[in-house]
Regions:
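Active-site helix/loop of acyl-thioester processing domains in fatty-acid/polyketide metabolism
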Residues: 101-116
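Hydrophobic beta-strand-centered segment that forms part of the acyl-chain substrate-binding groove
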Residues: 116-122
Length: 141
């Protein structure tokens, strides 16, 4: 018996308003506990993106940034060994606390796959709280 070929990869699109409404729905049920779920979602989402970027290891961070932009997660990124600066995160919405939980999970996944070990990713600055950009600190564990 011949198995059927794998279906072509398909994508769904959510706009910024829909992402915000989903976040508010979860927060209404789970309060801030849902932020960990959003982070884990980001990790899952980031797995295939990281694998795609690793196909060109020499240009991994440039490729990772391009993928994030192509998929609508960000408008601009800048990567170093210890920090990622993001402008135009899709998760930005006015708040007293950082809101880019999924993006933080995606970035952690990128660095863990690139470095081959565990890292901690902390959103130290967020455009949601009035800053001009989001900044994520990367620390090896």
């Amino acid at each position: 018996m011949v198995s059927a070929p794998a279906p072509a990869m398909r994508y769904v699109k959510l706009d910024q308003s829909e992402i915000r409404q989903i976040k508010e729905l979860y927060e209404g049920v789970m309060s801030h506990a849902c932020h960990g779920l959003f982070f884990k979602e980001g990790s899952v989402i980031g797995t295939d993106m990281a694998e795609e970027a690793l196909k060109d290891r020499t240009n991994f961070f440039e490729r990772a940034g391009a993928i994030l932009k192509e998929r609508g997660w960000v408008e601009e990124t800048s990567f170093t060994d210890t920090e990622v600066v993001v402008k135009g995160s899709i998760e930005v919405t006015p708040s007293d606390i950082p809101t880019c939980h999924r993006l933080r999970g995606i970035l952690r996944e990128f660095y863990e796959r690139f470095k081959g070990g565990r890292v901690k990713c902390t959103e130290e600055m967020c455009a949601s709280t009035g800053h001009p950009e989001c900044r994520f600190r990367i620390e090896e564990m």
